[in-house]
């Protein structure tokens, strides 16, 4: 008669049986692994012994975090500059007329600092990065366009332009800022890292977009569509990891909110088909005209204005600043700055803008760029596009929440037409307005608007990049 096992003995027997099954499964797994990947463990051991390789990866991701932090700081400074200008503008009637003196004087001051200390900071920043990505450019010229020092100079000058009340944005400049910060990582990387200046600048530029718009996906698409057309990436995995890391820094600071908050854009209905088509065509033509004006203004024409700008750059900048201030006075300050508040109010169906807002915002943004002051056109383009969508909605008899889909289409259409990047525009606007219900509508509008824009002009950024060298002399 067998003696029954004690509970402890039963547990020990079960444990031994489980251990035998585990060893058998492990052996089977190892045998299968050796058959399919005979060099697996050797490669793992080799990977773990490459200490410098892991140091390079740590440096890459560390500078990605630094890029995100710098862009976050840039965002906070830019918002502070906008609020400071609005505080000046809100000093009653005296403040409104003080702006007529404040804006031209500060515009001249920012232009003087730009021409004296950082001539490569003028303009958006995206053309500078595109030019720096040219393999035929020597190191000295590339460093003049993209460097850590240039990044901080760009931040200061753009904030100065926003403090002046000019119609400029900070999103385009973050491309140059991010590329400059990330390019500084090259001195800390080993020659075996395989990451050259091209990869670092692409990673930094796209990381800047990801952190600026709080959308890592937008940064990745921007890198693929705008920055790698001439040459691909040798280490795309680490470039994408850097973009995501910078975007995570922005999310950690500002939260997992979309650019304009949690907005719920309605799904397009068949009743909006004709107004939506009209928005796509109008934003495409208007965006192409705007891009053409920016390029022609930078290149110059044989006319009196171009001669005056070349001979008396500071007087010309003062004139542009005065015109922008007058436009702001007419619109009650709605055209000053990037246009975030106005665009958000339109998307919430709460804004009551003057009928000429879209045209005046268009002119204010063009004059701000023509003055030569550093600043981008991303956010102003969104505001102009939102205005076009709102105007067409009004002409179609729509208002309030019913107009929101057309406003979103106007944003994506004008941005795609201006920048020449329909996929980037579609992704950014979709993430900014949480418009996943309008995915196909936004994509179709971006592609159609971009096609109409190409009837008027070539890529604005490529045209501006071709004008960068020789660099202007310091004065």
Please tell me what each predicted stretch does.
Residues 1-475:
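Alpha-helical transmembrane segments and immediately membrane-proximal extracytoplasmic
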